């Protein structure tokens, strides 16, 4: 068995989300179908995060397994097209690239990536990297931290270029209040007030290690989030609440009351999915 790790970038606008669903085309379904087409094997993708409909990704991480060509033991394989370089096997021995030339090209990680990217056209999905990894690697459970960002366009008129990629807010936002309020959310808390009613997480306790409101490129506002894991809609619900604070509909001091209330109805609205990006995963 060979395990592959790939990084995926996608525009989530025209998809029902990451996960396979019966009511529309998902990113998982499309990727699995194209990988299977090239490899002639049934593939099951495991992702670091299951993004919702309309959410984008710059660095979604997935893994999948392929049966080895000899169907009996793991093989070392070329991860990229280079010459005269040693490649490590999963049993920590080494072999030269020359000895691997008989390996079918569909098991070569670089050629697999190139072929799948070709098959994905014209869909706005692309593999930005692909490599063979250890069987112990798991895209979801091996993750140490996940990073998201949310993009807001805060000006009088919407952006034609950034349509479906940002949240346009016409009224000027009080960014100072948004920054002040956001800092009360850093740390380990019960985030029930920012949790979707459909969330399946066993516990509402999460540790938010970073939340940063960046106005460097104003009128674009970017809000960055980092945590080992997130609740369903947690980032979008926090953004919606911060925007209400920026619009003076909620006072900055109220963020602590909202957090401790453990009541979703007290927080702001769920921000649109179009502004959310899954940036990267740390392992």
UniProtKB/Swiss-Prot annotation:
Protein family (similarity comment): Belongs to the tRNA pseudouridine synthase TruA family.
Residues involved in substrate binding: 148
Quaternary structure and interacting proteins, as annotated: Homodimer.
Record keywords, A-Z: Isomerase, tRNA processing
InterPro entries: PsdUridine_synth_cat_dom_sf, PsdUridine_synth_TruA, PsdUridine_synth_TruA_a/b_dom, PsdUridine_synth_TruA_C, TruA/RsuA/RluB/E/F_N
Active site: 52
SUPFAM superfamilies with a match to the protein in the record: Pseudouridine synthase (SSF55120)
Enzyme Commission designation: 5.4.99.12
Pfam family, one: PseudoU_synth_1
Function: Formation of pseudouridine at positions 38, 39 and 40 in the anticodon stem and loop of transfer RNAs.
GO terms of molecular function: RNA binding; tRNA pseudouridine(38-40) synthase activity
Family matches, as Gene3D superfamilies: Pseudouridine synthase I, catalytic domain, C-terminal subdomain, Pseudouridine synthase I, catalytic domain, N-terminal subdomain
Superkingdom, natural source: Bacteria
Gene Ontology biological process terms in this record: tRNA pseudouridine synthesis
Catalysed transformations (reactions): uridine(38/39/40) in tRNA = pseudouridine(38/39/40) in tRNA
Top EC class for this record: isomerase
Keyword tRNA processing: yes
Protein name per its UniProtKB record: tRNA pseudouridine synthase A
């Amino acid at each position: 068995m060979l395990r592959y790790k790939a990084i995926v970038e996608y525009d989530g606008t025209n998809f029902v989300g990451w996960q396979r669903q019966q009511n529309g085309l998902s990113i998982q379904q499309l990727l699995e179908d194209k990988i299977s087409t090239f490899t002639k094997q049934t593939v099951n993708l495991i992702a670091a995060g299951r993004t919702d409909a309309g959410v984008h990704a710059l660095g979604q991480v997935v893994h999948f397994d392929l049966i080895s060509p000899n169907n009996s033991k793991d093989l070392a394989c070329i991860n990229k097209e280079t010459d005269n370089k040693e490649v490590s096997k999963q049993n920590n021995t080494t072999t030269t690239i020359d000895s691997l030339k008989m390996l079918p090209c569909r098991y070569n990680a670089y050629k697999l990536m190139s072929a799948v990217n070709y098959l994905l056209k014209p869909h706005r999905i692309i593999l930005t990297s692909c490599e063979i990894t250890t069987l112990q690697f798991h895209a979801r459970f091996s993750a140490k931290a996940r990073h998201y960002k949310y993009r807001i366009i805060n000006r009088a008129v919407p952006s034609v270029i950034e349509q479906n990629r940002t949240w346009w807010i016409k009224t000027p936002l009080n960014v100072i209040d948004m920054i002040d309020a956001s800092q009360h959310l850093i740390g380990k808390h019960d985030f029930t007030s920012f949790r979707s009613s459909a969330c399946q997480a066993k516990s509402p306790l999460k540790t938010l290690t970073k939340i940063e409101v960046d106005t460097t490129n104003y009128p674009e506002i970017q809000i960055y989030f980092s945590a080992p894991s997130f609740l369903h809609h947690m980032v979008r619900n926090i953004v919606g609440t911060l925007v209400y604070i920026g619009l003076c509909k909620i006072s900055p001091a109220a963020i602590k009351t909202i957090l401790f209330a453990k009541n979703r109805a007290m927080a702001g609205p769920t921000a649109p999915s179009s502004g959310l990006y899954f940036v990267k995963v740390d392992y």
